[in-house]
């Protein structure tokens, strides 16, 4: 499970996301949805312990992310960054390599960018299968990308500056 409790994310002087809370349970895909520039990438970085929260805390399996060392976080979580050079094959390689070591959570930052519909569906199916195996899967994506996932196994958190709503 990945959780964010009362988190506030600031960039410079601007509150990007304010006072947000959500739970990404094991067994579900949780989509963090919002328009470009709304703070999805900063939110992902905060979940990974790479961007500080001005307020609140993020936890992974009940442990505050800020108390976990970077090597320990890498043992617990697979991160699929937005900037992968060769889209689908690299995204799947990152997943497979990370999961071979027993990691229990996946966080992906806009992984469908520049992918064809067919490739996006393949990646979404793989992420959905990982959730079905009991992993917490968090995907920052656009509203259109949510359609790649089975709605009965997906939670959607709509990001609206400076807040978030979970449905």
Model-flagged regions — what are they?
Residues 33-35:
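The feature captures the beta-strand-to-loop junction immediately N-terminal to the Walker
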Residues 31, 71-83, 87:
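ABC nucleotide-binding domain signature
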Residues 14-15, 71, 121:
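Short coil-to-beta microelement around the adenine-binding A-loop and adjacent beta1/P-loop entry
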Residues 126-140, 147:
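Conserved catalytic loops of ABC-family nucleotide-binding domains
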Residues 48:
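Helix-to-loop junction immediately C-terminal to a conserved catalytic motif
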Residues 56-64, 73:
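Conserved ABC transporter NBD signature motif
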Residues 4-7, 15-25, 56:
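Conserved beta-strand
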Residues 40:
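Conserved lysine of the Walker
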């Amino acid at each position: 499970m990945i959780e964010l409790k009362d988190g506030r994310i600031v960039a410079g002087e601007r509150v990007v996301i304010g006072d947000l809370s959500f739970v990404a349970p094991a067994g579900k895909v949780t989509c963090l949805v919002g328009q470009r520039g709304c703070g999805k990438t900063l939110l992902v970085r905060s979940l990974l312990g790479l961007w500080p929260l001005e307020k609140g805390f993020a936890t992974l399996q009940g442990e505050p992310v800020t108390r976990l060392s970077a090597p320990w976080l890498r043992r617990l979580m697979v991160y699929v960054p937005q900037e992968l050079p060769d889209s689908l094959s690299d995204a799947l390689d990152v997943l497979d390599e990370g999961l071979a070591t027993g990691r229990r959570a996946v966080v992906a930052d806009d992984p469908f960018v520049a992918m064809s519909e067919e490739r996006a569906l393949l990646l979404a199916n793989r992420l959905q299968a990982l959730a079905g195996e009991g992993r917490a899967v968090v995907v920052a994506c656009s509203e259109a990308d949510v359609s790649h996932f089975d709605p009965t196994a997906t939670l959607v958190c709509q990001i609206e500056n400076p807040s978030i709503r979970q449905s």
